[in-house]
């Protein structure tokens, strides 16, 4: 189970595919929060429409990395939301408890996110084996709590970034779709033609994740003419921001395209010569598997600063370029300048992308499925 963003769901689907391949008659169910259910249903149904996608009441404990504890405790609306969500967590626990009693699964697998907390706690109480996966280099609160009782723990980044018990923890990477593999030059050209993009020009793909990224979109709006001097641009803006941007940006052509979201992201990313994105763990590993030159713009305001810590892992390895968001907003031309530098030094950029590719774990879904099967109760 998982929820809150596509980064929690798409890896689960990769694992579901592997489990179904090994055990065609296995009974699978996907649980998530109600807010994310429509997207989760679409993602799961693309693999197998017979897998039920069910919702769990859940609440999140809001914490903001850029605020002090005192500021958070004296923010009335924040305190009110956290208190209200405490009751939602209790409700979700009771709901999960009875759902698990009725279903009695052999294993509960959680991918992270606040919706997993009540389910994981209920599984613990019912002594159902629990396997958790942590994608981010900074473990989330839910996984830090559930790790105390988890039968097995899998991580998306190398083990030195975690304090989990070593005897129960394994670095498997992040399960991703098998379509995320390096594109040859001919495959890249074919992908550009598939997207009706000029194949003779470099392609810059900008994506803020499934929900979009307002501040990255703002930079693209303000610098698009400058970016188009460097190459064609495709902006995946997020469904909630698409209409506003469509009204102020050029019509789609072979040098610029705007989308709310795309379903075949591997094809679009494969067509790219450089990708600009947030530092979500799943997106990072998809790009690593493609060996794409990548510019990360982490959101420093998210819980625990986990995107900042994700970015550091790959920046320290010389595998990506990283831009500070505040500095970028102060000097929006910095993005185009960084892209130009990558294009101006093709050998250096190719070496960076190759180092990035070493983080890919093509067997992550298989390894994750093996851990789940090993944990099941007899």
Please describe what each predicted stretch is.
Residues 8-20:
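Short amphipathic alpha-helix
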Residues 17-22, 31-32, 36-48, 60, ...:
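Donor-nucleotide binding loops and adjacent catalytic segments primarily
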Residues 26, 50, 124-189, 197:
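Active-site-proximal region of nucleotide-activated glycan assembly enzymes
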Residues 45-50, 94-109, 117-131, 144, ...:
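Glycosyltransferases and closely related glycan-assembly transferases
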Residues 49-104:
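Phosphate/nucleotide-donor binding subsite
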Residues 106-107, 270-285, 292-293:
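Acidic donor-binding loop of glycosyltransferase active sites
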Residues 341, 348-362:
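A short, well-ordered alpha-helix in the C-terminal region of glycosyltransferases
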Residues 361-378:
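C-terminal alpha-helical cap of glycosyltransferases
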């Amino acid at each position: 189970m998982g929820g809150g963003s596509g980064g929690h769901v798409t890896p689960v689907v990769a694992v579901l595919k592997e489990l179904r391949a090994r055990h065609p008659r296995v009974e699978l169910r996907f649980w998530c929060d109600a807010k994310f259910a429509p997207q989760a249903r679409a993602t799961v149904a693309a693999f197998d429409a017979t897998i039920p996608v069910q919702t769990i009441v859940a609440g999140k404990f809001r914490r903001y990395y850029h605020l002090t504890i005192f500021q958070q405790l004296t923010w009335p609306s924040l305190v009110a939301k956290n208190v209200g969500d405490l009751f939602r967590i209790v409700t979700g626990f009771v709901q999960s408890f009875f759902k698990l009693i009725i279903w009695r699964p052999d294993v509960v697998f959680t991918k992270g996110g606040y919706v997993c907390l009540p389910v994981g706690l209920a599984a613990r109480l019912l002594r159902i084996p629990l396997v958790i996966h942590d994608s981010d280099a900074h473990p989330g609160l839910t996984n830090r709590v559930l790790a105390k009782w988890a039968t097995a723990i899998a991580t998306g980044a190398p083990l030195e970034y975690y304090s989990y018990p070593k005897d129960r923890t394994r670095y498997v990477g992040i399960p991703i779709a098998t379509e995320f593999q390096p594109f040859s030059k001919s495959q890249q050209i074919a992908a550009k033609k598939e997207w009706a993009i000029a194949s003779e020009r470099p392609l810059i793909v900008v994506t803020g994740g499934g929900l979009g990224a307002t501040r990255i979109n703002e930079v693209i709006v303000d610098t698009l003419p400058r970016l188009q001097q460097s190459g064609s641009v495709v902006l995946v803006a997020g469904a909630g921001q698409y209409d506003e941007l469509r009204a102020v940006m050029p019509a789609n052509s072979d040098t610029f395209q705007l989308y709310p979201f795309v379903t075949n992201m591997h094809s679009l990313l494969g067509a790219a010569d450089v990708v600009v994105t947030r530092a979500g763990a799943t997106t990072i590993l998809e790009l690593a598997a493609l060996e794409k030159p990548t510019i990360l713009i982490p959101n420093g305001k998210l819980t625990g600063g986990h995107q900042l810590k994700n970015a550091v892992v790959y920046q320290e390895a010389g595998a990506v370029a990283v831009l500070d968001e505040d500095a970028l907003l102060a000097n929006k031309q910095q993005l185009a300048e960084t892209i130009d530098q990558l294009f101006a030094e093709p050998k250096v950029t190719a070496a960076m992308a190759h180092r990035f590719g070493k983080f890919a774990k093509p067997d992550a879904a298989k390894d994750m499925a093996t851990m789940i099967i090993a944990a099941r109760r007899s």
